[in-house]
Amino acid sequence: MAHPHVRVTRRQALRTAAGALFIPFTLRSGKAPAQGGRKPFDGVTLNISCWSATYPKLIADYLPEFQEKTGIKVNYDTPGFPVYNQRADLELSTKGSGFDVLNVTFIYTSRWIGAGWLTPLDPFIADANKTPADWDFADFVPGSVQPMRDKAGAVYGIPWISDVLIAAAARFDLLAANGFGMPDTLDELEKALQVVNKKDGASGFITENHWGWIYPAYLQAFGGNVFRNPPDDLMPTLDTPEAAAAAETLARLLNSYGPEAAAGYTYDQVTEALRAGRIIYSTHNHAFCALLGEEGSKVTKTSNFSMIPKGPKGRFPGVASHGWGIPVGAKNKDASWEFIKWSLSRDLIQRMTQKHGLGSVTRKSLIGSADYKQRMVINGIDTGRLFLDSIAMSEQGYMKYRTVHVYPQANAQITQALGRIISGQMKAKESLALAQANTIADLKRAGVRF
């Protein structure tokens, strides 16, 4: 356990970083606050943060509308995923008032909700004076909302995305020209990559370096899992032959067919490399893959998509929800709810899908609309259907490992273990044995009994 003075120093450093990253949208947009009649929340300022992805970055462009409507000023930032989670977890643990709205990260839902660090949202949803009937909470996909509930069913987050791992071949033309279709299995994928890698200057394979998100899909495809039987039995199972085989496969795909420094690619870098046609094939999130069909993409007419390839034991596409929540220490929760309501209104999300091709939305009425379905068809492939089919597969329950309260500790150990394997620092069996031992120790410190 860290000593108190170390914890304070770390917290101060993170909050200093947070201050440096916060950009009041009125300054960024160059627009002055609205003039004229008094707004409902004039004089209120909200501090809001979310990890960097398509939707939260788009929100920044629309914030002037929110201030015009409500009078609320917003300090808003979107750091990278690891930085955001570290900062949010630390701030929430103090029950402080530094943030008024935060993203409820999927892997932290059990920890943050179970610890009482977030505000229940049911009273806001049920109050007709705060939430009009046409906002329609029931319109959100139930599977996206479920991780945001506690054991009693109370809601602590409103989902803005369901992350779904799919397969994208930005240069499917190279696969087709060499007699290959979209690979259905990992074996088929590797056979194809052996032929097409480096053709027309394109590297064969890439995936983002959040190994705690990417690796479990490969792990389960080989018949392994992170825990023995989550959520009831949390004994880690990272040192199995299946775990080693999955890690060796992922490392080989990156090292044999990836670009230079493949192990360092973030999700944004993967997306841009695909859009530029520098990568032939990737297992990547649907929300990012949807951008292959948007303005600026060089591969709209050469792209193809499918569910992720299956391994010896099947196909297990990663599915995860993220949503807006209100920290228990937020000073003006009514204003916080106004932001959540506005940012997830049907009108705003619909405009984002129509203008920017926003994918992986969470409102049923939009997913089922003709406009959205058409927008999600890229080069003749219905990526929206792949999204829905992947979510349906997750109803088998294989994502349970990800919402137990101690998964963040396992996530950290997986990330370190895969980093050692892919870099060649350690063999898979050796690295995963170390991850197993470290995860058991971390879970014991967190109070898990074996």
Could you say what each language-model-derived stretch is?
Residues A126, A287-T300, G311-Q413, F450:
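C-terminal lobe and pocket-closing loops
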Residues K39-F41, K73-V74, A176, A392-F450:
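Conserved C-terminal helix/tail region of periplasmic/extracytoplasmic solute-binding proteins
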Residues A192-N197, D232-G264, I308:
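Glycine-centered hinge/linker elements that transmit conformational signals in sensory
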Residues I23, V145-S162, I166, E190-P236, ...:
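Extracytoplasmic/periplasmic solute-binding protein
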